[in-house]
């Protein structure tokens, strides 16, 4: 297996994204935060909203070079590598959500199943399988189809305002499968921005 070389543009972009993430998570004073360092309340997009997509982009870009040593050949060893990498990233997300583990009276009934690392794990695992099975020309219609399918799913499955916070299908599916207590509550109502159904376009 040939070893992949370092791609400095990816390393630099990763460093810039991490620096932006640190700035967003630690603005100094939450009472005086520049608007671009806050998430859009729902519709819209700020610089802060791009941090997570940047990380997903980096995962995809890195795969292109990391998989060179496997020659993109779908061998059992390659599948095993993808499986364990996916599981380890997903479990790291659970590890972070569960910490600290020995706090007295820890309430597991409100444990959040999904999050940033879990979303990255799902996106990595599925994308890796697609990359080693299909070439670029085949992937274009697949990616377009996934996005159109997700858009139609939200439109057909939602009620009232299918793209709004309260009545979208993503929220309904997560509540039905996991319950309100296991979802992120930062929007004032139970809604997980890294939930199960919303992993499709990622």
Q: Where on the chain are the PLM-derived regions?
A:
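Membrane-interface interhelical loops and short amphipathic "cap" helices
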Residues: 27-46, 100-113, 162-176, 181-191
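Long hydrophobic alpha-helical segments that form multi-pass transmembrane helix bundles
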Residues: 136-202
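An acidic intrinsically disordered interaction segment
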Residues: 20-27, 85-89, 169-173
């Amino acid at each position: 297996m040939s070893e992949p070389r370092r791609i400095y543009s990816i390393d630099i972009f990763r460093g810039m994204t991490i620096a932006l993430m640190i700035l967003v998570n630690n603005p100094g004073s939450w009472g005086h935060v520049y608007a671009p360092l806050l998430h859009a309340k729902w519709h819209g997009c700020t610089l802060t909203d791009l941090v997570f997509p940047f990380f997903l982009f980096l995962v995809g870009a890195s795969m292109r070079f990391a998989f060179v040593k496997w020659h993109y050949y779908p061998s059992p060893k390659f599948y095993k590598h993808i499986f364990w990498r996916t599981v380890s990233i997903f479990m790291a997300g659970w590890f972070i959500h569960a910490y600290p583990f020995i706090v007295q009276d820890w309430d597991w009934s409100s444990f959040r199943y999904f999050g940033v690392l879990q979303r990255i794990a799902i996106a990595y695992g599925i994308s890796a399988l697609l990359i080693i099975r299909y070439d670029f020309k085949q992937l274009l219609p697949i990616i377009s189809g996934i996005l159109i399918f997700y858009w139609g799913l939200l439109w057909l499955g939602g009620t009232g305002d299918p793209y709004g916070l309260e009545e979208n299908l993503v929220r309904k599916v997560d509540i039905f499968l996991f319950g309100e207590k296991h979802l992120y509550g930062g929007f004032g109502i139970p809604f997980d921005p890294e939930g199960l159904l919303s992993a499709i376009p990622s």
